[in-house]
Amino acid sequence: MDVAVVRSNLIDEQEALDRIISGISLSDWDLDTASPGWSVADQIAHLAYFDNAAALAIASPDEFQESVQKLLEMYSRGEDAEDAILSPYRTMRPGELLEAWRDGRRNLSEKSYNLSADNRVVWYGPSMGSKSFLTARLMEVWAHGQDILDAIGLKREETDRLHHIAQLGFITRSWSFINRGQESIDTPVKVILKSPSGETWEFGPQGADESVSGSALDFCLVVTQRRNLKDTSLEVFGSAAVEWMKIAQAFAGPATDGPEPR
C-alpha cells in the first residue's frame, strides 16, 4: 500500500468523523470523555492542533523542531503544556472549532500531497517514514473519534481502514515494552483478525505458537488503549501474547495504561 492510499484513507477517516460531529448537539460538545479533563470539544481541538503540527513538520522541519523545544521547555518548568496547546481552541464556539479542525485537515492534506515513500518526517521523538507518519495520523483521528463516540453514546460503521491501525498495533509490539523501560519479549506472536468486510488479516509468523485472534475492531480498541482486553472477545494464547496485550500502545508519547474493565 503506497503513501497516496494511506493519505486518501486518512482523509476518508477524518470526513467520517466530521459527519458525526456535524450532527451532534451543542451540549454534546461539553460532555466529558475518557481522557481526564477533556471534553468532546477538547478531543477535536487536539486533532486540530496536531494536524497543523504535522503539516508544519512536513513543510518546515526546523520550525517544527523549534515548536517542540518550546513545549519541552514548558514541561521542564513545570508548566502545563497540554493546556497551552488546547487553550486557544477552548475560546472557540463549537462551529468555530469545527472549522478550525477542517482548516488543519486541509493544511495537512496539502502539505502531504507530494510525500513519497522514501521521505521521512520529523516528529515528537524519532523521525518517521511518510507512510507510517500518515498512518499514525489516521490512528489518532480514529482513536479520538472513539472517545467522542463513547462520550455521546453513539456507534459508527467500521471500515477496512482499520487495517492501518491493526498493522500499526502489531509493529509497535516491541515499542510498547521499550517505552516502559522493559525488555522486549522476542517470542513470536501471530495475529489473526476478522475485518469489518469479512476478510481475514494475518500478521506475524504463521508458525508461532502464541497468538491473538478475534475482530479487527477489538484488536484496534486494545492497542489504542480504548478498551480493556477483558471487555473484548479477543482470544489470547501464550504468556508473551498476554503480556503484550496488557500494555499494548500503538501511539507515541509516554507510557500509559489502558482503561479498567467496564
How should these model regions be labeled?
Residues 1-45, 54:
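An N-terminal domain-cap segment
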Residues 7-10, 40, 98-101, 134-137:
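Hydrophobic packing residues in well-ordered alpha-helices of helical domains and bundles
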Residues 30-73, 123-179, 219:
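Short, contiguous alpha-helical
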Residues 180-223:
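Glycine/small-residue-rich hydrophobic helix-like segments
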